[in-house]
C-alpha cells in the first residue's frame, strides 16, 4: 500500500438521500491540478476497494473533498455513504486527468457542463484564480433530476458572482439561469 496515503474523515454532508460529500485530511505530499481525479477507497480485508473520484477541493486547500452518489449495492459507495468523522480512507498518492485548465487555450468564455456528481471536478476549477485570469466569463451548467440535487449552490454562486450558473432539472422540466 505504499502508493496510498491513509486519510481521516473530517466531515460528511448528506445533500439528499442519494448524494453526499466528505472531506478528509490531506497528506502534504499529495499534489494535484484542479480538475484531476484520484483513486480512493477503503481497506476491505487484506485488499483495498478502490474507485476513481474527482477531487472537489482546490489544490491549495489543506483538506480533500469528494462528492459521491449513494449506490445501495455499490461495492464502494454502499460503504462510503456510512462514513463518519474520524473514519479512515485510503487515497492514491497520484492524481491524474485531462480536465484541467492547462489543457485549454485562453478564451473569452469557459463552459463547464456536468450532471450529478460530474460537478465535482468543476468545483476545484471554479476555485482556481487562474481560471478567471484566462477566461472573461465562466458558465457552469449543472444538470440533475430534482432541485434538491443542486448541491454546492451557495458556494457556486459565491465563486461565480459575475459569471453564470445554469441548472437543468430533468424530472420536473424546471430550469434556472442566473445572469
Kindly label every feature range from the protein language model.
Residues 75-179:
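FNR/FR-type flavoprotein reductase catalytic core
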